[in-house]
Amino acid sequence: VEPILSPCSGTVERIITKEENHVHEWEKLLLIKDSKGKIIDVSIGISGVITSLNVSEGQEVNPQTVLAILQADLYGFGSD
C-alpha cells in the first residue's frame, strides 16, 4: 500500500482517476494548482489500483496531504 502525497501546497484543480481504477506508472492522477497558479500533474512511479481517494476538487492541500492510496501491483512492467 502506497500513500500518494501532494507534491506542493495548492488547490485540487481536477481529479482524473477514480477509486478502484487501475493506473499505470506515471499516469496522471490529479491536477493541483499551486500557490503561483501553475498546474502541477500528480503521478506516481508504480502501477496499481487506487483503493482510496482522500481529496475532492477545490480542496486545499499541502505536501503532507495524502491525496490517495494505491495498492501496488505485485508484478512490474517496464521498458528500456
Regions found by a protein language model. Give the residues of each.
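Short beta-strand-turn/beta-hairpin segments enriched in glycine/proline and small hydrophobics
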Residues: 1-9, 28-47, 72-77
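Short phosphate-engaging motifs
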Residues: 11, 22, 49, 60, ...
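Short, charge-rich amphipathic interface segments used for partner binding and complex assembly
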Residues: 44-63
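Hydrophobic alpha-helical membrane-insertion signals
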Residues: 16, 54, 62, 72-80
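Preference for bulky hydrophobic residues occupying beta-strand positions
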Residues: 15, 30, 42-44, 53, ...
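A structural signal for short beta-strand/turn segments enriched in small hydrophobics and glycine
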Residues: 20-29, 58-67
